[in-house]
Every structure is written in C-alpha cells, then in structure tokens.
Amino acid sequence: MNPRQNLDKQMLRIITGYAVGIVAAFLLGSMLGTQVVLASVQSMGLEVSWAARVDATLDDLLGLSATLLPVMALVLAVVWGLYDVIMTRMRSARGPYHYALVGGLCILALHPLLGAVLDVDVFAATRSWFGLLTQATAGAFGGWCCGRVRI
C-alpha cells in the first residue's frame, strides 16, 4: 500500500469514527432526554403510556435533529479533533475510554455554557442534574463508539 492510500484509509477511519460517535451520542441523548422530560411530566401526576413514550421519542429524534444534532456534531467533532491533535503531538496512546471521557465532559459543559450564553435552557432535559448527567452519558457513549471505530 502506498503512502497516499494509507493516508486515505486513515482519513476515512477518522471521519467514520467521528460520524458514528456523533450519531450515537445524538440518538442516545435524544432518547434519554425525552424520557427525563416524560418522567417529570409523570411526577406531576399525569399518566404517560408506553405508546406515548415511543411517540414522543420518535418525534424528538426528528425534531432535535435540526437543533441538538448540529450543535453536538460541531462541538464533539472539534473536541475530538483537538484531542487527536494533542495526543498525536504528545505521541500518547489513545483508547475508546479516552474518547468517552472527552465526549462526556464536552457534553457536560456544553449545555450549561449554552444556557449561560443564550440565557435560556436549550434542551429541557438538562434543567436537572440528572438530565444533564444523562446527556453527559450520551456524550461518553458517543465518544466510546468513536474511539472503537478510530482505533
């Protein structure tokens, strides 16, 4: 394999890893976020059926793909890219758990920062610590998926 083919293969793996990680983080984050919001509706004494949960989850996946997905994609791609550059320059080993840590911390910081800058809760599920931690978990899962594909 010549150096050009090797570089092309490496770039494809990087792009695929980032894409898989972003989609995984978004899907899990959207689904968990919907369930957090529905749990708070249920805590007010309203009944939420499984059919309503499935409907709301599907609606949110579609609706949030225009708002949450682009924000997560931009932030995660930039942070994972910076992580890759730093680790390459330091000649340090990378692992799926490192990408998970970076992704989780990134999303954990993202929502409060957006709230502070825009003076509004961008994603209702992150109004509570539990909701924010579910989103960080989604970012960590996306990072783990990214790392598994990348390495």
Which functions belong to the PLM regions below?
Residues 2-151:
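Juxtamembrane/disordered regions of integral membrane proteins
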